[in-house]
């Protein structure tokens, strides 16, 4: 599982996934929640 896979599964761009992983505050709560859901599902 890579960042690209997380992005594809969540429907967000690789950059957005990277910002969530790095705790950047410039990500909407909805996007963060969806991406974290995918990350947790795949134990990334």
Regions found by a protein language model. Name each.
Residues 1-44:
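N-terminal helix-turn-helix DNA-binding module of bacterial transcription factors
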